């Protein structure tokens, strides 16, 4: 049973492509060459500015994605600046070339209009798409946030939607 759970957890975040040496993946993002490095991160996790990040291809609701990240001693990714936003986009593009919608750790599930990262940190950086957040054009049904592939910006969405996600290890809030 433990072996089955271990294999399942590996499959949740298994990359669609893996490098030959297992330590780094090179990818092209716009005109910038970006390397995803494992550093001291576990298998299937990639290092950036002292944190480890994992793309999870399995489609889950926002809450289930957060629970999965917590089971990995992490949270859905919190993004604190443009450089980190670019890294997360690179990570998503590496594993999903179409860059489909992907959950990040931002939500206002605790209080409407009060956006907060799932790791408890305050929001000091945003990358909203034009007209967002809009709560579903007037409703109060969109409380969780995903990245939008083509515009590479953020959108609020119903938390029950099943999407891939990005986990990141915890840090002290900036």
Indicate residue ranges for each PLM-predicted region.
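Extracellular, disulfide-bonded carbohydrate-recognition/adhesion ectodomains
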Residues: 1-174
């Amino acid at each position: 049973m433990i072996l089955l759970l271990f294999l399942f957890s590996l499959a949740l975040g298994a990359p669609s492509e893996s490098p030959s040496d297992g330590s780094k993946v090179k990818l092209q993002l716009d005109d910038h060459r970006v390397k995803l490095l494992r550093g001291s991160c576990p298998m299937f996790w990639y290092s950036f500015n002292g944190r480890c990040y994992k793309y999870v291809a399995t489609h889950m609701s926002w809450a289930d994605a957060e629970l999965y990240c917590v089971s990995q001693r992490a949270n859905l990714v919190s993004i604190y600046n443009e450089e980190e936003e670019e890294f997360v986009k690179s990570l998503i593009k590496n594993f999903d070339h179409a860059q489909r919608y992907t959950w990040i750790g931002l939500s206002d599930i605790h209080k409407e209009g009060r956006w907060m990262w799932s790791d408890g940190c305050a929001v000091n950086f945003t990358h909203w798409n034009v007209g967002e957040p809009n709560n579903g054009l007037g409703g109060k049904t969109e409380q969780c946030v995903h990245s939008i592939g083509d515009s590479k910006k953020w959108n609020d969405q119903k938390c029950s939607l099943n999407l891939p996600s990005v986990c990141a290890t915890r840090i002290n809030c900036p």
